[in-house]
């Protein structure tokens, strides 16, 4: 249903906003092209244990593998690649592989995101503003990544680098009071 800009849509936003602790958790990326490459930095920044499965990879993904930042299996996706995985991101050019990987992840209770296909997503990547411990996430529920990025840029201006120092100071004050 398409609604007017006034917000008369009856569609409910049932997404649950959450920040996950991924440190040490196993995350799998199926595919190693540009779309997959874009998802890697956020997982690495979260201290996740990242594995990539794909027959070929972009030079950047190959570099991360060489540097020991992630594990790259040079092969096609198989269902056993999901063994022990907490979260999966699927970013191949094959709709059949994307669908199969999502369905297998769903059967195993693994959170999964198929890049650029809202119908096969348990979660969406938000646009994020980071200022030290402050993180502001913006989601359009997969409707418009461009709008989310524009809002991120506006918030980055509104919440400049000085917020990092302020928040660290507030954290120190809070700790001294507890």
Question: What residue ranges belong to the model's regions?
Answer:
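Residue-level detector of alpha-helix initiation sites
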Residues: 33-35, 95-96, 142
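An accessory alpha-helical subdomain
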Residues: 142-178
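Short loop/edge segments at beta-strand edges and connector loops
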Residues: 54, 72-76, 116
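Hydrophobic, well-ordered beta-alpha structural blocks that scaffold small-molecule cofactor pockets
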Residues: 1-56, 61-64
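ADP-ribose/adenylate-binding Rossmann-like module
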Residues: 87-94, 98-125
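Glycine-rich, highly charged phosphate/nucleotide-binding loops
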Residues: 65-83
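Structural motif
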Residues: 26, 86-87
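Hydrophobic beta-strand scaffold residues
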Residues: 50, 72, 111-112
């Amino acid at each position: 249903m398409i609604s007017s800009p006034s917000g008369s849509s009856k569609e409910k936003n049932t997404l649950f906003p959450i920040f996950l602790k991924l440190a040490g958790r196993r995350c799998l990326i199926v595919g190693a092209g540009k779309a997959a490459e874009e998802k890697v930095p956020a997982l690495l920044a979260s201290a996740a244990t990242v594995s990539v499965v794909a027959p070929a990879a972009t030079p950047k993904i190959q570099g991360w593998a060489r540097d020991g930042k992630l594990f790259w299996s040079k092969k096609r996706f198989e269902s056993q690649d999901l063994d022990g995985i907490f979260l999966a991101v699927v970013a191949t050019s094959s709709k059949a592989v994307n669908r199969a990987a999502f369905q297998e992840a769903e059967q195993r209770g693994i959170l999964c995101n198929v890049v650029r296909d809202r119908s096969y997503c348990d979660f969406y990547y938000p646009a994020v503003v980071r200022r030290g411990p402050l993180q502001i996430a913006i989601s359009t529920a997969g409707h418009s990544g461009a709008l989310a990025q524009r809002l991120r840029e506006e918030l980055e201006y509104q919440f400049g680098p000085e917020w990092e120092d302020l928040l660290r100071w507030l954290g120190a004050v809070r700790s001294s009071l507890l």
